[in-house]
């Protein structure tokens, strides 16, 4: 038989090579189309990796920490990667007992330097911060490698578990009963201008409110005292006009049934936290309000 005729002859379905091609094709379909339905959510998350000094990785060694990039104002290092736990040491709404617990954990020189840069910055706090996302995995070392989810769910490596967003209990805030199932998560920084130093209050809010202007109207009513200090500063010190009363940034969303209280254990110390299970990262920009 002519070789060209043999080449044009249809392949036998029982041929081993043909079976291999069929199997590979089916596997590609699973990896591309059907994969988002395997765990009842789309796990095609956007991730990034950051190198962090060992002294800044304490509670951050466990998944779920909110990671923030801070401008130092120096040539080296220009940026530091800190978490909400370290930022809570300088939050005015954190209780003295929680602050002492956090200070007893973050005793390394890198953590102390980060706290000094937080205090000495010339601008309002949110002008020097950029929220990056949530920590998923950590490779510990002298310089630790943190894998951060910037958009999507906090899946583990095998995509079989969704990690929770961990918030210190003193920094958690809610304004209404969880009537609806969907809860939007916001980061709120509010400034208190009473006294010689401007003190920031840092909160993580869960709310069913999605409309921006409605959220701002509620925030103005809840933080009436801080707004009065803002107006008083503008009247008494017109040359030192503050920029705003506070800022709001969207972090993502979760379900009302997935909000629980828990403990975070590190070096035999227990930190009371609020755990947002099945949290999905969906970052927005800092938006100021007065």
From Swiss-Prot:
<dbReference type="GO" id="GO:0042025">
    <property type="term" value="C:host cell nucleus"/>
</dbReference>
<comment type="function">
    <text>Structural component of the T=16 icosahedral capsid. The capsid is composed of pentamers and hexamers of major capsid protein/MCP, which are linked together by heterotrimers called triplexes. These triplexes are formed by a single molecule of triplex protein 1/TRX1 and two copies of triplex protein 2/TRX2. Additionally, TRX1 is required for efficient transport of TRX2 to the nucleus, which is the site of capsid assembly.</text>
</comment>
<dbReference type="GO" id="GO:0003677">
    <property type="term" value="F:DNA binding"/>
</dbReference>
<comment type="similarity">
    <text>Belongs to the herpesviridae TRX1 protein family.</text>
</comment>
<protein>
    <recommendedName>
        <fullName>Triplex capsid protein 1</fullName>
    </recommendedName>
</protein>
<dbReference type="GO" id="GO:0019069">
    <property type="term" value="P:viral capsid assembly"/>
</dbReference>
<keyword id="KW-0946">Virion</keyword>
<dbReference type="GO" id="GO:0019028">
    <property type="term" value="C:viral capsid"/>
</dbReference>
<dbReference type="Pfam" id="PF03327">
    <property type="entry name" value="Herpes_VP19C"/>
</dbReference>
<keyword id="KW-1048">Host nucleus</keyword>
<keyword id="KW-0167">Capsid protein</keyword>
<comment type="subunit">
    <text>Interacts with TRX2, MCP and capsid vertex component 2/CVC2.</text>
</comment>
<dbReference type="InterPro" id="IPR004999">
    <property type="entry name" value="Herpes_1"/>
</dbReference>
């Amino acid at each position: 038989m002519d070789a060209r005729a043999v080449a044009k002859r249809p392949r036998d379905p029982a041929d081993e090579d043909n079976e291999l091609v069929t199997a590979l094709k089916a596997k590609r379909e699973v990896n591309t189309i059907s994969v988002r339905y395997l765990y009842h959510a789309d796990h095609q998350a956007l991730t990034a990796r950051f190198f962090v000094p060992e002294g800044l990785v304490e509670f951050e060694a466990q998944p779920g920490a909110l990671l923030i990039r801070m401008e130092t104002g120096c040539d080296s290092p220009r940026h530091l990667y800190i978490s909400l736990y370290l930022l809570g040491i300088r939050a005015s709404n954190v209780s003295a007992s929680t602050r002492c617990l956090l200070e007893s954990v973050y005793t390394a020189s890198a953590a102390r330097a980060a706290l000094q840069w937080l205090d000495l910055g010339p601008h309002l706090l949110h002008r020097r911060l950029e929220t990056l996302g949530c920590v998923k995995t950590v490779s510990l070392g002298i310089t630790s490698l943190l894998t951060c989810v910037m958009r999507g769910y906090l899946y583990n490596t095998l995509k079989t578990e969704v990690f929770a967003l961990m918030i210190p209990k003193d920094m958690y805030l809610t304004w209404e009963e969880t009537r609806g199932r969907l809860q939007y998560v916001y980061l709120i920084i509010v400034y208190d201008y009473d006294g010689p130093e401007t003190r920031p209050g840092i909160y993580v809010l869960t709310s069913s409110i999605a409309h921006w202007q409605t959220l701002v109207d509620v925030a103005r009513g809840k933080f009436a005292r801080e707004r009065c200090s803002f107006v008083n500063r503008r009247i008494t010190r017109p040359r030192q006009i503050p920029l705003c009363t506070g800022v709001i940034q969207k972090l993502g969303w979760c379900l009302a049934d997935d909000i629980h209280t828990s403990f975070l254990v590190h070096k035999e110390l227990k930190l009371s936290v609020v755990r947002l299970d099945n949290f999905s990262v969906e970052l927005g920009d800092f938006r100021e309000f007065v």
